[in-house]
Every structure is written in C-alpha cells, then in structure tokens.
C-alpha cells in the first residue's frame, strides 16, 4: 500500500532494471507484492487473536504479561489485605473515641443515638446543666477518662474551651397579647475558657452574663475543644503508632424552636506525627519491610503498565494496516464492530488498574512514613485497582469455551440492558420524587431522596416489605390510603414486570450465546478475511519458492511492525 509499506530489500541478483521488465512482468510482480502483503497481514492478524498458549506454540513467545498478571494478583491482594487491616484499626479507633466522647461530655447520653443526633433536652434547666456538665467534664478529663488523652490546641493555638452562641440580633416577646418581634439577622458571641480559668474556685465563669440565655432568641450553642490521643493498638501489629488530634464540637441546636433542643457531637480526627517517641522492638524494621514491599509492587505494576501500553499501541497500528488494506482491496470501510475488535478492553482495564495501584501505593508509603493522613483516598484507589485486577483474570478464562459464557453473555446483553434501564429509570425517579414529597413527613424511610431511592431499591429485591408498610404513621387517612396505593403499585410494577423483563433480556442473550456455540457465530468481515486463502488461482503458477522468499524478506524488513501481543 502506498506510503504504508517499505520497499522490498531484494538480493542483488533480483534487482533488475525496470527497463528490462515488460508490462506483463511488472503487472505480475505488482500482483505478487500485493499477495505477499496480504499474507503477511493475515498472519499478523491470526497471531494477534491467538491465546497466550497458542502464541507460544506458534512462535515460542513467552507470555510475559500472563505471568506478570498472576504475580501482580498475589502482590496487590497481599498489599490490600495488610492495608485493610491497618485501616480497620484506624477507623475503629476513631469510632471508639467518638463514642467515648459522647459518654464523657453529653449529660444523659444513653449509648444509642436518637436519629441523626445524640440526645435531646426539653427544659431550660436541662440546657444549663448539659452545658456546664460538658465544661466540667473537660476540666476533670485526665481524672475520669480511661484513654490516653491530653489537652490539645485549637485552631487559634489556644488550649481550653471555646463557647459560642448564636441568636437573633434583637427580639422581644409579649405573652399577654401573643406577639413576638424578631430581627432575623443572626449574631454570634463567643467566650474562651482557659484551663487556668476553669480551675479557679468558686466557678465565677458560670455566673457571667454570657451564660444567661434568651431561649426565644437562641438559635444554637457550640462548645469546641481539642484533645490529643495515641493509638497504641498499632504496636501489637508491629507498626509505628499514630498520634491523633481530635477537634470536637458539641452543638445544642434550637433552630426549630419547637421545645426540643437536639444535641450533636462531631469529632474530627487528624493524624499527626508523634514527637519524642521511643518504641523498642522490631517496629521500625517491620515498617521498612513494608515500604520495600510497596516499592516492589510499584515496580511490578509499572512493568505491567509498559507492556499493556505497548500492546495497545501495536494493536492500533495493526488496526490501521487492516483498515487501509481493506479499503484498498475491497473499496469499502470496515464496520465498527470489526474495528473495536482491535481495542482490547482488558488491556485498558489493566492499564487503569496499574495506574491506580501505583498512585495508591505511593500514598500508602506516605501514610506509613506519617507524611499523609488520608486513609480514605488510598483505600479507594487500592480497593478499586484490586477489583480491576481480579476482573481482568476473566480474560484468560475466556479462551476456554466452558468458562467464557459469562463474558459473552455480558457483552451481548449489556447494550439492551442499558437501554432498558434508561426507560425503567424514568419510572423509578418518578416514584422516588413522589414518595419523598408525599410520604416524607410521615415515614422515616422517605425523609430524603437518598433514603427513598435506597428504600425503593430494597423493595424491588423483596427486602423489608412488611416494615415499610407498617411504619407509615396513620395521622392522615388520605396519606395512609395513598401510601398503600403507592407501595402496591410500585412493588407490582417493578417486581412482576420490570425485574422479570430485566432477567428475560439477560436470559435471551444467554440462550443466543449457547445457540451460537453449538452452531457457530455469525462471521464478520474480519473473520471472513482471516479464513480466505492468501493465493489466487491466477497466481498458482508462480514459483512458490519466490513467494516464500519475498514474504520472508518483507517480514525481515518490517519486523518493527509485527504485532507480538500475548
């Protein structure tokens, strides 16, 4: 093909001047050259679509990527398990401390949160008692706490408590004629109580005017303080323990002015580098081993990334050769399905997995070195990459007809399933918005859109049906009747019709694949080209030795363009 192939590097005895060749000879050699290029392209295509075992038998090419993927699965999974155990300790330590803080600083906390808040109070006396209780508990923290806690510095580099109250700017209430004048602008007043102030006797700080609350104007009271802690359970795992700074905020929420003040405790834990720590044993050596292991994982993923990227590039080159040849010979373009055969989705998946593993491993090393503290991003990267690695193994099982039914069924049913889900999703969203608007005030499972979507999805799978029916409040007969019509229609529509059709689409694709496996798949243009004979009847009289020589010479010159993909 012009511009795409190099000229033949023939031996000196074969380089005859064009003037000695007649028109018949030049036409024959041109046809022979086209025949050689077609045979070379067909061989490269056949080799590209071979399995690693077939490639090894054909050209003795060792399947490096297959061996590397198997090794990578073992290494990445081991890395993920170790990181998951470490992350589990971190999350458990944070949650345990949050529960401990609620018991320490919230008066009357029962151990179980009320909805999304911890506890609630209903009288002015209980409000003052709860505020002063939290302050006094902070003062006597080291004498009452079981944990290794200490006082930390807040964001303004001060040790102690910061109490802020938000209230409407001005207001006046006259109970005689039931009038209330309120300026909707909210102002915030704050006071800082140092440890020296809290330890004074008598407690003069409690008698200040700041703690005289006008409850009809009060919007919110916040008590903020910082505490330090050490996670010593990491020592049992032969790791360097983490030091934490807990930024705690106790919020008394009176926004609704309904006679009920909700109390929240929010604790944000930040990991910091421990200072002046001396731990004997093999902890430091164990950390070094983990860092070396992470470096080895990065090297394996980098090698896999290079090999897969090279394979993708070579596949695109082969695709370009085939498209140009097909257009030149048959005067038509290759269909899109055949073009996508050259884009190996498994290589793309492995490439993405390698990139995520490399980035996640680097973050993990920084976390082990106490330079970073964000476990969540690292866990998402490592977890997703491990998922992709294990999914990529299916590619090698797909070479066996017994195991590739799942892959072929997913490929065949995915377009139809996506189109079906797009239509069913419109109905699902309609039910979601309707349930949120109508049933939200009367049912805890319909309070917001996220919970409604989760509740409806559970109903589609047949989970928790009776509880959803039973928990509706019968304060309004009209809403109660509507809830029955709403739930019965949704369950009937999605379980008996939508879900059944969804399964039928996948089942139909499965039966189609089984039928094709028994009677053969429909042949595409690419498959027909691979089955064609490379030589035509008009050129069978040409010496086969010359054809073989030309093919070998051409392959020797165009060796860089061969597709050697295992």
From Swiss-Prot:
Keywords: Adaptive immunity, Calcium, Calcium channel, Calcium transport, Cell membrane, Disulfide bond, Endosome, Immunity, Innate immunity, Ion channel, Ion transport, Lysosome, Membrane, Protein transport, Transmembrane, Transmembrane helix, Transport
Localization annotation: Cell membrane; Lysosome membrane; Recycling endosome membrane
Sequence segments annotated as region (Extracellular/lumenal pore loop): 107-123
InterPro entries: MCLN_ECD, Mucolipin, PKD1_2_channel
Gene Ontology CC: lysosomal membrane; plasma membrane; recycling endosome; recycling endosome membrane
Family membership noted in the UniProt record: Belongs to the transient receptor (TC 1.A.4) family. Polycystin subfamily. MCOLN2 sub-subfamily.
Recorded domain comment: The most N-terminal extracellular/lumenal domain (referred to as I-II linker or polycystin-mucolipin domain) contributes to a structure with a four-fold rotational symmetry in a tetrameric assembly; the structure contains a central highly electronegative pore with a 14 A diameter. The pore is critical for Ca(2+) and pH regulation. The protruding structure formed by the I-II linkers may contain all the interaction sites with lipids and proteins in the endolysosomal lumen.
Protein name: Mucolipin-2
Name of the coding gene: Mcoln2
